[in-house]
Design a protein with these regions (language model features):
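Membrane-interfacial and juxtamembrane segments of integral membrane proteins
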Residues: 1-113
């Protein structure tokens, strides 16, 4: 299933400052969210609490008190995914702009729109 921002943490996430999360921890958190429905309740609760606590360390903006651990995991992963997407969009736009400048008017052919 797609990774969605938990509505309960959307307001927090819109202004939260989250430092880049270690790739191994991101993979572990994603794997947990994919498999959590199949885990025994005690294992799910303990694993979720542990991952949420480790991910909270990357949040410079404190996560709201009482937030469910699995919502914390999802929110921080969504923030990270969205930052990655914005970075990639910026990179692609810059590359296209450089390519456009580099090829504009070559060989006496006017650039096309």
């Amino acid at each position: 299933p797609p990774l969605l921002m938990p509505p309960a943490l959307a307001a927090w996430a819109s202004t939260a400052v989250v430092l880049p999360v270690d790739r191994a921890l991101r993979r572990e958190a994603l794997a947990f969210l994919r498999a959590n429905a199949e885990l025994a309740p005690a294992v799910r609760a303990a694993g979720g609490a542990d991952l949420a606590e480790r991910l909270r360390a990357y949040a410079e903006t404190p996560v709201p008190a009482g937030a469910h651990p699995e919502q914390v995991i999802a929110a921080i992963l969504v923030i990270e995914r969205d930052k990655d997407w914005r970075r990639e969009r910026t990179r692609v736009a810059a590359t296209q702009e450089r390519l456009g400048r580099a090829t504009a008017g070559q060989f006496g052919i006017p650039p096309t729109a």
